[in-house]
Amino acid sequence: MTEQKNKTSLIEFPCTFPLKVMGAVHPEFEQAVLDTVRLHAPDTQAHHITTRPSSKGNYTGATVQVKVENQEQLDNIYRALTSHKLVKVVL
């Protein structure tokens, strides 16, 4: 498969991107998400994340406002989050 060199992105970089993360109800979920994002976006602070329980209380939802410089950085954050054991879905 040939990789496209000139991909057209709908996102203009750099930007602040809202990552939506759903995961397990766990006391360390919020910190785990924050720590994982910080691996690729070290300037991300605790006040950049908000969490809320799902309607039935089975999951926790988090929104992280992340400053990203390019598509590669955003892709790396997605890969890191989706591979975390407490994370179910990343949008």
From Swiss-Prot:
The source's superkingdom equals Bacteria
Matching InterPro entries? UPF0250_YbeD-like, YbeD-like_sf
- This chain's protein is named UPF0250 protein NMC1112
**Cleaved signal peptide residues:** none
| Family in the record | Belongs to the UPF0250 family.
Q: Which Pfam families match?
A: DUF493 (PF04359)
Record-linked Gene3D superfamilies: 3.30.70.260
Organism the protein comes from? Neisseria meningitidis serogroup C / serotype 2a (strain ATCC 700532 / DSM 15464 / FAM18)
Recorded hits in SUPFAM superfamilies, A to Z, give:
YbeD/HP0495-like (SSF117991)
